[in-house]
Amino acid sequence: MRMIDIIEKKRDGKSLTKEEIEFFVNGYTHEEVPDYQASSLAMAIFFQDMNDEERAALTMSMVNSGEKIDLSDINGIKVDKHSTGGVGDTTTLVLAPLVAAVGVPVAKMSGRGLGHTGGTIDKLESVKGFNVEISEKDFIKLVNDNQVAVIGQSGNLTPADKKLYALRDVTGTVNSIPLIASSIMSKKIAAGADAIVLDVKTGSGAFMKTLDDAEALAHAMVRIGNNVGRNTMAIISDMSQPLGNAIGNALELKEAISTLKGNGPKDLTELVLTLGSQMVVLAEQATSLDEARQMLIDAIKTGKALNKFKTFLSNQGGDDSIVDSPEKLPSAKYQVEFKAKKDGYITEIIANEIGVASMMLGAGRQTKEDVIDLGVGIVLNKKVGEHVEKGENILTIHTNTKEIDDILYKLDNSITIESKGEAPTLIHKIITE
């Protein structure tokens, strides 16, 4: 088999066989296929697309390129949730203990944040003593005993994806549905999930800016999952403004705790119940989404979900007293109010700009080496569609420095007030095929 023949075949719009895709992925992983041929094939895929069989083959070739996490010793159906990323996306912190409280095993592998999106692990490390560097054996035992545990990402999962991702970044082939879908799904499958729930974001703070693109990606990932024996569902949710009210590590953890107590922001609570219902159904703990939703609402009302979160924290060395006393979490020295300059309705809060402002305060990393300031960030007091009066506080900046003119300038350009406005739709679609 020759790489040039595979490139020409795809260039001419023909379908590649499973063997041809495996030949490319194995060759590229082991440096037998040079970058220039790999980028040529990526560009051919970008223009000619791939059918469902090709996408499934590409995904599984990337899964098989490295180590795989074996979670077969965990009882029950392991359901993983993946979000395509956003700003203030606190869902995992609420979802994991919530679905665990109704019997869904959550074996979560999480990363750290880079850029304007915070990683789940950064948020959890706001809790004194919390440790994600646990052995696979301990991880499995924790999930069997308590239904939920979080571990840091392992080094050698999907090396083919890492190489291809870096190449796409510099060759103009990032925005290709088959390449994005296989990249995301290969990581989830290699991490041992039996079933997968996807939260595909759309809007200004999302990778997929338009609803059509988000829908195409959601369908692609759901089909890949179902074609390789992993039950998969997706929802398309709004990320034109930040999710919930808090952006920043300890601030988001406080918000997660109040959501588990039943006092969280409306949008975060709704998204968690929608995603959680799918996880409960895929884990076969309920037969319908309505039944699953009611189970989750009850787990919040009775305090079961909150207790599960406490146990989860203490199991991994964390100080669980922060659940009852969130003021023990890291906090910033100063709180600066950002006030409305006129009366009207908020029509826009640009999600990624708010994320960047939060990163500039120290809540995110610009490079992998950066140390995060866990206490800083931004808390929204108003959301899109809400009325404000001149001089009313729109958001509060939690900062450890008084030198924030550049941040105030950025916020000024990220929030729009007009004479009328309405709240965006939170959940656009549910995709099951």
Swiss-Prot record:
One of its GO terms (cellular component) is cytosol. Binds 1 K(+) ion per subunit. It is an enzyme of class 2 (transferase). Signal peptide: none annotated. One of its GO terms (biological process) is pyrimidine nucleoside metabolic process. Phosphate binds at K81, H82, S83, T92, K108, M109, S110, T120. This is Pyrimidine-nucleoside phosphorylase.
